[in-house]
Amino acid sequence: MTGVSIKFDNPEAYDQWMGVLTKIVGDRFLTWLQPNTSKHWIDIGCGNGASTEQILEKCSPSVIDALDPSEDQIKFAKSRKLTKLANFSIGDAEALTALDEKYDYAVMALVLFFLPNPERGVSEMVRVCRSGGQVAAYVWDILGCGLPTNPTLKVLEARGVPFSIPPSSEISTVNALRTVFEKSGAKLVETTAFRAERIYASYEDYWDLSFKSIFVSPAVKNLDLKLIEEIKTEVKENLNIDQPGRVKAKAHANAVKGTVP
């Protein structure tokens, strides 16, 4: 369902509701890449800098350039402790300003499904990577109900409340990721999936953070308070809540990597 725009204008809130799960998936993604140290990286669509920080922490790059179209996100990214070593800029994933064959690794973390033209984005990744370099990406499996906020979105959909998902959500399947990478000219293309869980201390904790998400917040912020409470109650009924009242939230992402010929 669409009808509400997705905006990245609150990086602090994004980090609160998404940070734990993206840290888990991001670490597994970088381990899967098995990168060499002291290499040149570009983090395309770096958002609030979480992925850039993970690359710096786990991969010891000699150079890392990071770009995002949101000034708010870039400002927040620069405030992270480790990201002082990164080169941040405002940029378009489908029209990179980098020279051809500049990097050893080009990555997109939770980005491809937000691009109007994912094929163009992947082609740009391949263009800026050296021969033998690696291009890679991961996305929440939206069509496979992999979004962390999926329990809430299901209730909104059932009630006819408009909300938006990324515009190119069809790219989130394993087959679609493999196809777009192979069409870009990448070789030795591989795919995998990562699952992650987060434990919330209570349902109130879960709801408060979900309410801040870029998918839920725009859809419910202007609703009648009575309707919001009804949605809140219905979501709770569909969650895995243990005896102490903790909520176990699950998400899963699909990933792809390939080598530049």
Put a short name on every predicted segment.
Residues 3, 22, 48-50, 169-261:
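Conserved Class I S-adenosyl-L-methionine
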Residues 5-20:
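Class I SAM-dependent methyltransferase Rossmann-like catalytic core
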Residues 20-39, 54:
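Conserved alpha-helix/loop element of class I SAM-dependent methyltransferases that forms part
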Residues 30, 53-56, 122-126, 153:
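A structural alpha-helix within SAM-dependent methyltransferase catalytic domains
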Residues 40-96, 120:
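Class I SAM-dependent methyltransferase SAM/SAH-binding core
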Residues 94-106:
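A short acidic, Gly/Pro-enriched loop at the edge of an enzyme's catalytic core
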Residues 105-118, 141:
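A short SAM/SAH-binding and catalytic strip from SAM-dependent methyltransferases
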Residues 119-120, 126, 130-201, 217-220:
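Conserved catalytic/acceptor-binding region of the Class I
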